[in-house]
Amino acid sequence: MRYTSLFTAVTAALASTAAAVGVSGAAEGFAKGVTGGGNASPVYPKTNDELVSYLGDSQARVIVLTKTFDFRGTEGTTSGTGCAPWGTNAKCQLAINQNSWCDNYQPNAPKVSVSYDNAGVLGITVNSNKSLIGQGSAGVIKGKGLRIVSGAKNVIIQNIAITDINPKYVWGGDAITINNADLVWIDHVTTARIGRQHIVLGTQADNRITISNCYIDGVTDYSATCNGYHYWGIYLDGSNDMVTMKGNYIYHTSGRSPKVQGNTLLHAVNNYWYDNAGHAFEIGSGAYVVAEGNVFQNVKAVAESPISGKLFSSPDASTNKVCSSYLGHTCQINGFGSSGAFSQADTDILSKFKGKNIASAAAYNTVVSSVTANAGNGKL
């Protein structure tokens, strides 16, 4: 009788643990309603090949990472001639001559020898209806990013780190690429030591995207600004995109943090930018940006000049009241410390937000403690 009771208790405990494995919380903002792999039984890849297979097949899946998956060296290396557009100082990034980029766009740059890891150049394909989640702080992908493209939809990436993708080389690879997709939630993801973009949304329609609680770590040995600050942070360039950025920690970058253009509606709320040696926002034609409740600390230029797109920077309490008719709340002012100016009130863009799923906004004075405690993997 005791053995039966013990067996029953153990079985129940295991079942409870299994049932608890899954996505934590729910997406706010434009990707609200995303379910990823839903209630699919979790799978635990043990090898790189298993991980690639689970992410790329046609089944709804909850994929749990319990270890580091290191792709470096798995697809060989390529050596050749690249270029040094930013100089030959040991701290400068070099460029791979991808699609003759050096020849066509940097013909006067010094030619240099390059040797890069092939695995990093193109990320792992992620198909529709997937949840990729890390267990604790153990879920890490090294040397290769993720690609959510070609019509993929309903995808959740949560609580993992993506690191060490050819950091010396521009065109060496991106951490997360989204292009021609819909309903994608990137949450509690750490990216570090990346050759090109930490997160990039391509020129096709990427539709409804939420990027939340992520840690964009720009500390690097090589950068396009030759100073240890990564330049290629976040690039939002889709033709019909709605992007929520909330609760992210964007640290030690020098540009494109984010660059916004194409036809992109961006709600940037309660993010923390710290220690930027160049510029954070780059707002190009076709960008419609509402920024509220953020903190900019030691950011040389909060927005690169000129601003070609549209911006509502939530400049003051009186002006911010207009938000309530469109976003459902009064916009929160941003906080600044040793940072450049950021004040523009293109109120005509607010109507574009009306009727959409809009993330809530807290006062900026809560942001630093909240973001530093919660952003990145291992902090669920």
UniProtKB/Swiss-Prot annotation:
Residues 1-20 form the signal peptide. GO terms for molecular function: pectate lyase activity; pectin lyase activity. InterPro entries: Pec_lyase, Pectin_lyas_fold, Pectin_lyase_fold/virulence, PEL. Keywords: Carbohydrate metabolism, Cell wall biogenesis/degradation, Disulfide bond, Glycoprotein, Lyase, Polysaccharide degradation, Secreted, Signal. Glycans are attached at residue 129. It comes from the Eukaryota. Pfam families: Pectate_lyase_4. Its EC number is 4.2.2.10. This is Probable pectin lyase A. The lineage of its organism: Eukaryota, Fungi, Dikarya, Ascomycota, Pezizomycotina.
